[in-house]
Amino acid sequence: MSSLIRRLNSLRQDLWRAARGQGQKATVQHYAQATGRRQPPPQPVALATTAMRVTAVTHETPSAISLTLVRQDGADIEFLPGMFFTLVLNIAGREHRRAYSISSAATLRTSATITIKRVPDGLVSQHLVDTVAVGASLNVLGPAGAFTLRPQAGRQRELLLIGGGSGITPLMAILRSVLAIEADSRITLFYANRRRDEIIFADELDALVRQYRPRLRLLHVLEEAPAAWSGACGRLDVEQCTRLLTQAYGEDLPADLRVFQCGPAPMMEAVRTSLLAQGLAAEHLQQENFLPGRREQALANSVAQPLTIVAADGQRWQGYAAAGQSLLDAGLALQAPMNFSCTLGGCGRCRVRVLSGSVAMPGPHGLLPEEEEAGYALACIATASSPLTIAIAPPTPL
């Protein structure tokens, strides 16, 4: 992982250079906002991307594809299972960022595969599914993310993976990696979909179950099940999850059980409720939120708002957040060492704590309700709605 850390440190240096380059521009924009002049919506901060080339396109379902990527410079791609890339695309002259999880095993070094499902009315997902072909070049940020597991040879774990729809993607990377590296670990997968033809990786999952039984168990849930379906039927709600847990583990969950889940927010809330009711410790549950792209937000403040950023060591940065400007972009313009990853409100890496003032933050997002109640916000999507002071965590490797 040392080369990965070096590349991430290089990315942070690029970030600082980008922030310094935007400092004067931000001051002009803040002054114009304070004088009441109308300004265009602030643009995302420009960050250094990695050029990658598509070497394979696999059609997983009628609405989902997998893209195998290699670096244009030929370097290895190092990542932990569960991480994602943020694709930076220009469509019709406008920049769009979307985060897509890596689905391939971390045992690979020369390539990485991301899986993309077409979203109704989703401009970027439709563009990728319909137009990207072998040989295409893509600019990406990352890999990044905190929804990760580090496989270790000789380690023995009891893992429960719970996915809904395209939420199987990061779980597939975890599953493939653990099966390949940890010969004594056991995995149970609950996988919920609307219809049978929407099951991503269906054939491979069946093959893996045959190959690794009894180390791997798979329990499907379909909302619209065919007549001959032998699996669970209906939504993966609290009652359904409780039934599946009993089917998989009996009356008591294993003491060492660790759970990773990814899928629609209602499903994940239901699963969380069921697991905690069955005695799982909250710290033994990790979840990844699949969210839409960077939002077109209504301006939460009509004029610039004073902003103070406080680091753990007491260092301060003071300036203004422009109307509609995210706290992340405002902090970078002030050259504060802001943590961030997906820039979409999903991963939680940009979490800051509001010390005074108020913010506007659209949902859905990656914070838990108790985190919001404790005063936390996601800097990449939150905007200042009053004079604001926030605390940031020390810069940390991704």
Where are these regions (language model features)?
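Helix-rich terminal scaffold detector
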Residues: 2-31
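C-terminal accessory/binding modules appended to enzymatic or scaffolding proteins
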Residues: 303-339
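FNR/FR-type flavoprotein reductase catalytic core
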Residues: 1-10, 127-313
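Ferredoxin-reductase
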Residues: 36-137, 141, 154-158, 193-195, ...
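Short, surface-exposed secondary-structure boundary micro-motifs
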Residues: 90, 143-144, 355-358
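Short flanking/linker segments adjacent to small metal-binding domains or redox-active Cys/His motifs
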Residues: 224, 382-398
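Residue-level marker of beta-strand positions
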Residues: 84, 136-137, 326, 333, ...
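Local cysteine-cluster metal-coordination motifs and their immediate loop/turn environment
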Residues: 336-361, 369-386
